Amino acid sequence: MSIRIFAHHWTKFILACCIVQLGACSASTANLQNSNAGNNAPGQINGANPSVVTGARNEPRNGPVTDISRPTQIVVLGSGTPIPDAKRASASLALIYQGEAYLFDVGAGAIRNATKARYRYDIPALYPSQICCVFLTHLHSDHTMDLVELAYTMWWRRRDGLLAFGPDGLAGMTRALAQFMAPDVSLRTGGNQPTPNPLGYRVSATEISEGIVFEKDGLIIEAFDVNHGHVKPAYGYKITTPDKVIVISGDTAYSEILAQKAVGADILFHEVVSEAGLGGRSIFWQNYHNSAHTTSSNLAKLARSAKPAKLVLYHGLHFGAPEQKVVEEVRAIWDGEVILANDLDIF
């Protein structure tokens, strides 16, 4: 009898413990949900884990418009190089002006970063299907790899097809992309999927030469030749708006033309090679980079001549040297403001 009574009471005790534990878990879950609801609106970066986007949105086709009263801004979508990097997408900069986004180069990872920047800075124009235009400095893969993602991500929701500007060869590249993506277009338009704009996949490619290549509502974009070794043509861009002058180098060795275009610029975005890192490479790679890219000392001399208000280093090759070393190398010669860009920086 005593054994039965003991077993009965022990069973009741275990059940009670389970009920208490379940209640505690439910309360904890509710508190966590309430906490997350308060801290992270849809699409915002999760505060506890900045790499997690808590609510990717399917933007409406005619969604919110970027505030046209904002001053001219540049968002760094890619500060990296051809070398895969978990922290840096390949080269890409986004100009935000009068409610539109204009991309300059579109290396691998740039479009995912554009989506992050759209929500981080509340810039609807950076949602991929809202980006109107892209300007390419040259056709190396680390400057063009995300062109297909830009043109074809949710293409059916574009109001208009993408406008692309760049050097000779761009038209052939966009035709090849259209052929590559033809099965996707056929599958989406051949069934019952709603396609608000069945021609939204079309890319209008303009092969440019030196001079003004785009003007709209006070925005002037000028292309100029740069010296990227045997890659010809290769362009830099000078952007002029009512409130800013911005110069983008693209890939280039020291360029007198670029130095002239950058005189008095508000911001000069320039590629750079760390001399400390380059010294450890083979003579063949040293010869190549000296002929096609700008070393830190040459960039400092260019900045000393042009005197931009702000020099932003992007597309930096460090070759094992600490990243800040290249900043020190520039500052040893030029005493102006120097910033080493990171992905999603905004200026």
Regions found by a protein language model. Give the residues of each.
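Bacterial N-terminal signal peptides
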Residues: K12-G23
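Low-complexity, intrinsically disordered or signal/transmembrane-proximal segments
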Residues: H8-H9, Q21, Q33, Q44
